[in-house]
């Protein structure tokens, strides 16, 4: 849903007058009560408050099914529903909760992957447990296990990349199932504004994801967030402010989505994005975490000058085949590695520490 955007696209097209706002809070590997995060990461309830959630579409059970203990899962899910029903993330009322079952495991007939027959028994049990919790707690339930099996059976192409993670086409088909379950009608799959709206949704999702799952979260929330540099300025001081900047950028892209669903084209207006905090350089020994030895010389030698300084074994020769002068995009290299074909790969982050990453070979 985060990377393919089909469900939101269909919802926005079907109800353009509603100006719906979607925020994806999922991480790969999440369970109801175990969600791997950086130390200090904002807890799930507080993040739902940031998103001002009115409706929560909850997709649990697939990861828990590997534990093969649906009874325990049922108790944990029940507790989560109770806690969530007691919140007012939007500041006015308790959220409406919809529990979805896990999808089935697709048999890809691959010798390198399980066929899913055994796991589907566990997934079916977790789907049943989810349905029971929904009934007991008076919240809505949508079965995806049975419909996903039906999709696998009738599709001419595989709908998952590995049996459990949906492809773009798989997500498209499942989004149509979800849409019909939620709204009681067929998804607008042939809408004339579909491609424009989907592109706007994906751009908005990309901005949101850079806020929700910021690159190098250890500097934002974790153990390095409290490190202080010049005049006591910390990583958290600057990076938490950047999160608020991305919030504004994401909100402006909601407006682009809403316009696209109505067949209009607007450009995201980022004029209201707060100015970044000026980060003070630690060059010159001004920071408690820096010193002259650590900083070295900030005047970099040219590639040709560097080659002249190398001490090589007899018979060896060094030459420059790539540099920032030849390829300006290669600035800010983060990692280098040699691939199995003998090619040197470089990973750069032009906007370190977030948003843009590039690979070069």
PLM region spans:
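Structural recognition of the beta-strand scaffold that forms the well-ordered cores
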Residues: 21-26, 54-60, 96-101, 140-143, ...
């Amino acid at each position: 849903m985060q990377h393919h955007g089909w469900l939101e696209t269909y919802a926005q097209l079907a109800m353009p007058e509603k100006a719906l706002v979607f925020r994806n809070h999922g991480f790969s590997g999440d369970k109801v009560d175990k969600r791997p995060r950086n130390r200090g990461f904002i807890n799930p309830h507080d993040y739902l408050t940031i998103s001002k959630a009115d409706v929560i579409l909850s997709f649990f059970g697939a990861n828990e099914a590997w534990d093969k203990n649906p009874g325990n899962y049922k108790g944990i899910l029940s507790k989560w529903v109770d806690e969530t029903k007691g919140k007012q993330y939007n500041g006015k009322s308790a959220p409406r909760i919809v529990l979805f079952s896990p999808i089935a495991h697709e048999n890809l007939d691959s010798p390198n992957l399980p066929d899913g027959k055994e796991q589907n028994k566990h997934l079916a049990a977790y789907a049943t447990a989810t349905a029971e919790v929904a009934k007991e707690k008076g919240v809505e339930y949508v079965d995806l296990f049975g419909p996903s099996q039906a999709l696998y059976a009738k599709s001419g192409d595989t709908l998952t990349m590995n049996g459990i993670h949906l492809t773009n086409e798989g997500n498209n088909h499942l989004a149509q199932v979800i849409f019909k379950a939620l709204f009681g009608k067929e998804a607008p799959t042939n809408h004339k504004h579909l491609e424009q709206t989907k592109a706007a949704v994906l751009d908005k999702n990309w901005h949101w994801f850079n806020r929700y799952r910021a690159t190098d979260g250890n500097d934002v929330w974790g153990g390095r967030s409290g490190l202080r540099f010049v005049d006591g300025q910390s990583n958290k001081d600057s990076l938490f402010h950047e999160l608020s900047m991305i919030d504004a950028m994401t909100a402006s892209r909601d407006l682009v989505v809403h316009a696209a669903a109505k067949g209009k084209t607007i450009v995201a207006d980022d004029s209201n994005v707060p100015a970044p905090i000026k980060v003070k350089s630690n060059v010159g020994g001004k920071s408690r975490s820096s010193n002259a030895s650590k900083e070295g010389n900030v005047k970099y030698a040219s590639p040709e000058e560097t080659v002249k300084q190398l001490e090589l074994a007899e018979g060896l020769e060094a030459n420059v085949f790539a540099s920032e002068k030849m390829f300006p995009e290669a600035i800010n290299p983060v990692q280098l590695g040699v691939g199995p074909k003998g090619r040197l790969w470089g990973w750069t982050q032009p906007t370190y520490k977030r948003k843009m990453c590039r690979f070069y070979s």
